[in-house]
Amino acid sequence: MDIPLVVPMPPNWRIDWAVWEAAQPELFADMQRTVDAPFNGDAAHVLENAQTACERLTGLSEFRSLTERQRQIVFLACFFHDVGKTLTTKRIKRQWVAPNHDLRGAELSRYLLWTDYKLAGTMDMLSFREAVSLLVLHHETPLMFQDVLKQGDAESLFSVKSLAANGILVPDFTLELLGVLGLAIATTVDEKEACNRFMETAEKNGYLHEPPKFADDTSRFAFLSRRSNDSDVVVADDTWGEIIMMAGLPGTGKDTWIGRNHPELPMISLDEIRKEIHVLPTEPQEPVVSLAYSRAREFLRNKTPFLWNATNISTDIRNRQLSLFAQYGAAVRIVYLETSVDEQYRRNRNRVAVVPEEAVTRMRRHLVLPTIHEARRVEYIMV
């Protein structure tokens, strides 16, 4: 099934739900089984909530004035905006809750677009897929923007500028699309007003349609990590050198990229440490990680640039390493590699140490790409 088949088009803007459900019956069933009434008054389940929001979206002039590609991105994000509730909804003390449904929804939408629609392996497909995922992740931000405004102009400016910065790596993501999504899922007058204020603030400061510009990588990272309050100030680089952190699923060619681009750097490779101490990828990894961190600290104490070679597919894992590197005054460059689904599986099967395909699938399901906020330099490279 192609994406255009499920996205309403002019002149009638009709949504053919039957076509979509026939292509993804399990997803529709999961959404229909998940209760939503406690969260969205009139909707009995998540599927009804999603369909109602999509119908509202197609009637918005703001949606109809977008380009076809933008409409596809926003429409998919609108349908997926609460899909994370299928994984997180539970009853605690007689109340229904869905903690972190935005994060899990972003992961699930990325996984579905990657596996079902094969949106991987080119920058064009990555940008489309990640724009949808980012919209799902941040779908509640416009609805709650009134709370941000109460914190003052400086905080509201940082909020929109920091969010818009995602467009540096993901050009298809804009605050205009996030605002339009907000208008579609808003169910109260206050939420709609908050969305309008969000878009007005973004447009006033020049970030509605494009990401902000910064003097250089150091100044950008200082602002986004809140070490600098003024995004227009050039911040001096006080680091002694750069650590390269690799990221990407098994079989994306990290070793090959390293050999071609930085054979001169000493490397900490979790794969090599596993071989060294005879630990399988499916076994507990604490001994592997402990030895890797010990060697990293030695390089850092000696102010020796090095390369950290591992999958690094989650924000939590990366943050632990980034925190360590920052403690020693090092700058970091994150290099994320991606290839198509079929090519990634082929390369993994040809590895000396093959990672079981079910493990790779599990990793892809929970993969979170590094963002521009995480390090001084972040690169997406298609291989």
Tell where the protein language model's regions lie, with residue ranges:
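N-terminal pre-Walker A segment at the start of P-loop NTPase domains
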Residues: 202-238
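Divalent metal-dependent catalytic cores for phosphoryl transfer on phosphate-bearing substrates
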Residues: 59, 63-194
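Conserved phosphate-donor/acceptor-positioning beta-strand/loop module used by diverse small-molecule
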Residues: 328-347
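Conserved substrate/cofactor phosphate-moiety recognition/catalytic segment
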Residues: 255-306, 342-345
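Acidic/His-rich, divalent-metal-binding segments that scaffold phosphate/diphosphate chemistry
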Residues: 1-92
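Active-site metal-coordination segments of metallo-dependent hydrolases
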Residues: 38-52, 93-107, 288, 311-314
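Glycine-rich phosphate-binding P-loop
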Residues: 242-262
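Conserved GTP-binding G-domain of TRAFAC-class P-loop NTPases and closely related GTPase folds
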Residues: 264, 342-383
